[in-house]
Amino acid sequence: MEMKQINETTLKIMITMEDLEEHGMELKDFLIPQEKTEEFFYTVMDELDLPDNFKNSGMLSFRVTPRKDRVDVFVNKSDLKEALDFNDLSDMEDYSGLSPEEFLKALEDNFMDKGDIEAHHKLEEHDKTLKEVDETMTEPAKEVAEETIREDYTHYVLAFSDFDQVVTFAQGLKNVSVEGSEFYKLGDVYYMTILLYLADEPDYYANNMYARFLEYANVADRTRPYLQEHATILMEEDALPVLQATKWS
């Protein structure tokens, strides 16, 4: 493993396939938010000699970029103390009875409570650096990454013009089960990432599901890595089932 400091708030860790294997990790492990992935990230950081300003810091965010012969992990340091956990809303009297607008405001207020406004604005300042980092990923590397995950999984990014459209999407797909889903807000637009497991499904399954999604959602103009770094994440896992199970007033 090798580490390079891009600037005071961003590290780049280069992990070989052999390193992944030694730690019991596979590329597909990075597609689904889980404790195993988070533990791996912090194990790697413990093994490396981190710069002093990254030790005992606030919240760290991670982004994975697959390469042909390695995985690049970009570690971003912020002043936030912790990330939003949907379980934090458990102390609300009855969020299932909220209107869509009230539900959304509760999510956003909960997120902003995790750190001061200045800290959140600092996250946006990483835009230029992360954009330059994105441009270092060559087309062949992207193709390798796509081929790697295409066998068992596929993911989509969907856009919604307002929260009412999100609610309609969730209600219209109440019988649909997905492997993973995340919910973001960027500007006035809402985004949802959907991860589908394809190994046990017929060849046409992915196309059919995408067509169903687009009955209620729009094609997104942002990628998941972009949203991870630039958007406000409202629900970082199980977004679709949570919205499906919510009763709107």
UniProtKB/Swiss-Prot annotation:
InterPro entries in the cross-refs: MecA_C_sf (IPR038471), Neg-reg_MecA (IPR008681)
Gene3D superfamilies (alphabetical): 3.30.70.1950
Coiled coil: none
One MF annotation (Gene Ontology) recorded for this entry: protein-macromolecule adaptor activity
Domain of life of the organism encoding this protein: Bacteria
Complexes and interactors: Homodimer.
Entry's free-text remark on domains: The N-terminal domain probably binds unfolded/aggregated proteins; the C-terminal domain interacts with ClpC.
Family under the similarity heading: Belongs to the MecA family.
Annotated function: Enables the recognition and targeting of unfolded and aggregated proteins to the ClpC protease or to other proteins involved in proteolysis.
Name under which the protein is recorded: Adapter protein MecA
Species per Swiss-Prot/TrEMBL record: Streptococcus thermophilus (strain CNRZ 1066)
Lineage: Bacteria, Bacillati, Bacillota, Bacilli, Lactobacillales
